[in-house]
Amino acid sequence: YLNYILNRAEMDNKPVWDGKAVVSRVETGAGTPISELLRQEDFYDGAGAVNTYLAYLRVLRRHHTMPVVISEFGVSTGRGMAQRDQNTGRNQGHMSEQEQGQALAECWEDIMTSGCAGGCVFTWQDEWFKRTWNTMHAVNLQRTPYWSDYQTNEQYFGLLSFDPGEEESVCYVDGDLSEWTEEDKLLDTGERALSMKYDERYIYLLAYQEGFANGEKRMFIPIDTTPKTGSTYCENYGLRFDRAADFVLAIDGRENSRLVVQERYEVLRAMFYHETHDDDAYLDPPDADTPLFKPIELMLQTATPLLTGNWQASSEVYETGRLLYGNANPSSPDFNSLADFIFAGDYVELKLPWQLLNFADPSRMSIHDDYYDDNYGVEYITIDTMYLGLTDGEDEGRTALCPAALESWGNRVAYHERLKASYDAMRRLWR
């Protein structure tokens, strides 16, 4: 490229390749600054839809005098999202494997339409060791290879997945209860029962409540992880517990189920309060036993008043604690890799990614410490037990939370390879 710059004057009158044929340099706009070419673009595709990716590719191809190959293009199947695409819907994360395949095919069509010579999908396989800007504060970056952080989008751009378990995962959230055993049970009153298991990616729960009837009633699962904070009362839902809970899992139908976190233990507040509320989170922190529980959100875009001139603009966030209903078994015809929970009569089967519960390194059972007590941000403590309960919200007394033992796996990671649905989509496209 340096040689091109040095010899640009000599090349001014030479013909160039426009992606389809050899034409004069003046016809293509080759060498024109990209910023100028962007001002000339209309940003629409052939169907009349706004497509900034195609517009960028057209400009990039016009700027150069040689064939252009797009060295990487891709989207992530991670549960977490780092950026929302405003016009094509090809988000950086929170896309199912089928949506990933569709997005890759659309990107390839744009690459070909723009006149580029080709491109390379990013990437062949998932990468557990990766980090991303809107979750890296929440995890131990020295330990990311030893667990699968489904909240970090950067780890899941691959066409090949590394799923937990040597041959299969310990649980598939699909409504088939045959994989659950008596050893998994934490409590069983006859009218209610709760079981738990876990692997390198998720905590899995199976909850039974008499009369639940595929979500006709509500169900609440309080969770206590840290001894430093938590509340015995959840103001949001009017729930009382016999231990201070840090999270409440609210199963409220297919469309309104979510995990909420006690305000004191909300990591977004501790790390991004200035960006979201233009204030210092540490000047007046919530009480350690505050009964207010908040939606769990991820930062998507920090405000840019210097660029926009809007000094009242707040940063963009989205609710990552909201749960998606569906079948999460890869062998099922209705498989949705983003599905969090499914009903099965009076049962609900669900999975929670570790980071959503403020685990910084589950391979060592390391969680977030209190952000405000002699700390300034995310520090870690280690636990060997968490506590969970189950209620329909109509109990007169306090809901009992039962212990669940946690055992770290250290560096001994179990995984198996699986081709994603997006692999099949690209194979069909490139046949």
Model-assigned labels for residue ranges:
Residues 1-87:
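Glycoside hydrolase catalytic-domain groove-lining segments
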Residues 63-68, 112-118:
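Loop/turn elements at helix/coil->beta-strand transitions in domains of secreted/extracellular proteins
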Residues 78-113:
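Surface-exposed substrate-engagement region within the catalytic domains
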Residues 85-86, 99, 110-115, 122-186, ...:
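Aromatic-rich peripheral "rim/lid" segments of glycoside hydrolase catalytic domains that contact
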Residues 175, 201-210, 346-354:
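Short, well-ordered beta-strand segments enriched in hydrophobic/aromatic residues
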Residues 186-305, 368-392:
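Surface-exposed, glycine/proline- and aromatic-rich loop segments on solvent-exposed faces
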Residues 194, 396-431:
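Activation corresponds to long, low-complexity, non-globular regions
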Residues 215, 299-304, 310, 321-401:
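Ser/Thr/Pro-rich, low-complexity mucin-like regions
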